Amino acid sequence: MSTKKVYSFLSQAFIFSAIMLISNIIATHLPIPMPSSVIGLVILFSLLCLKVIKLEQVESLGTALTGIIGFLFVPSGISVINSLGVMGQYFVQILTVIVVATVILLAVTGLFAQFILGKDKKETEDTKELKVVNKGRKHGKVA
């Protein structure tokens, strides 16, 4: 393995580690329980959108982690199996939360998609109208 690849991997691992450290610190100080991994994803997304971090700086390690994502779920699966007693005790409540959250998620996603598509449709109509007006001006038909 070339030295450049090793340094690239180490720099990507450092970026991910720094983001996770920051997200862990934030999670411990939040008044509501929120997983540090979710906070880390939001931080990484924000840094990528703001172009503080370039995609090339984290892409290959991110791709490698995505490739082994199934393996990364093993500890979560073991935790679920260890918690089956608690889950059985609160089965109805857990099932209710899952169903309600799924319905809310589907509704919000659908409404948001309709909003975006409606906005896109309006922009398309406005663009067509503007082209017609500009075309008329070129031919001296519109004052």
Swiss-Prot record:
The lineage of its organism: Bacteria, Bacillati, Bacillota, Bacilli, Bacillales. One of its GO terms (cellular component) is plasma membrane. Signal peptide: none annotated. One of its GO terms (biological process) is killing of cells of another organism. It is found in: Cell membrane. Inhibits the expression or activity of extracellular murein hydrolases by interacting, possibly with LrgB, with the holin-like protein CidA. The LrgAB and CidA proteins may affect the proton motive force of the membrane. May be involved in programmed cell death (PCD), possibly triggering PCD in response to antibiotics and environmental stresses. Belongs to the CidA/LrgA family. LrgA subfamily. This is Antiholin-like protein LrgA.
